[in-house]
Amino acid sequence: MKFYLFAVLAATVLPQAGAASLACPELASAVQVGTCPTEEDLKYTFTGFCSDDARAYRGETDVCTDFEQYRKLKNVALWESADGVFDAYVSCDLPKNALKAAKLSGVRVAKQGKLTQLICSYPNGVRFTYRTRALCTADSGVDCSVNPGSCMANCEGAP
């Protein structure tokens, strides 16, 4: 009886294993969840970011030689897919209607430490990413610009 009770509890509490297919988001329904920095914010943070001696000693001063390079790097806002599963930092210089009209151009899977990233690429360097500890696979040989529906990934235990 005790074993039966344990088995029932384990079946209801433990996550169910199995692969789930994930599709890259349609950007027409993407939502901006972060705000774009003001010019004053960028100028203020440029001074602080580029005056960090540790960064200079590591030789990481590329964006500190020109404010426009720094602005290009830091003038971004956080966006999410409509369901909140994918997110991206998108340049605030990219018009919203251009972002929302962007079509999927590629999909790939990458590892970063113990995390797996499913990276969906769009024009203008836009990349929406899904992060998970699960194992994911994607067919990188598919041309997503021709048939976006064929660009899927399979992730163990994905939402």
Over which residues does each language-model region extend?
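Sec-dependent N-terminal signal peptides
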Residues: F3-L14
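Residue-level signal for functionally critical sites in structured catalytic/ligand-binding pockets
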Residues: F3, A17, S121
